[in-house]
Amino acid sequence: MTQEIQPGVFLHVLPTEKFKTVRFMIRFSARHTKDNAGARTLLTSLLETNSQNYPTQTALSSRLAELYGASFGVGMAKKGNLHQVNATLTLVNGKYVGDDALLAQGVAFLREVLFAPNISNGQFDEATFQVEKENMLSYIKSFAEDKQAYASLQLQQLFFKEDADQ
C-alpha cells in the first residue's frame, strides 16, 4: 500500500503476517554540511517533543498512550555524506486489539508531528526551543566525559580534516 502523506512524500507499507506490531520509519535525507548539522539535530528534538495539536510533551505522550502504548522517536544518522533524519513509530497491529482504524490513526499521528510542528509566526515555541537547545548543548559538553565517543570524534576530525563538511 502506498499513501501520499504530503506532496512529494510517500508512505510505503509492506504487509506481513509475521509480526504483532507495525513499524513506520520515515527518512529524510540531505547532503551533510557543517552548517546544517546542528540545526537538523535540534530539529529532531523539537519534532519529538510536541506539535500543533499536541502542544506539550504530556499531550503528545497521552496520544501515544491512546494508540495502545505506541512508541515514537525522531533521530538522526550520518551515512557517508548524507545526513538522515529518521522518524519512527511502532504500534500494535490493530487486529490484535480489535481496532481496524489503528493503522490510519498511526499515519495521521506521524503526519501531524512531522508536518504540523509547534510553530507560530515562523518560529518554534520559544520555551520548547530553549529547553531543547540547552539539552543539545549539555549533550555536546558531555562528549569529553565519554572517552569512546570523544575518541571517535577526534578520529573523524583527523580523517576528514580536508573536508570541512564532514
Which sequence ranges carry the predicted segments?
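N- or domain-start disorder-to-order transition segments that initiate the globular core
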Residues: 1-22
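Short, polar/flexible loop-turn hinges at active-site or ligand-entry regions and domain interfaces
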Residues: 50-53, 94-97, 116-125
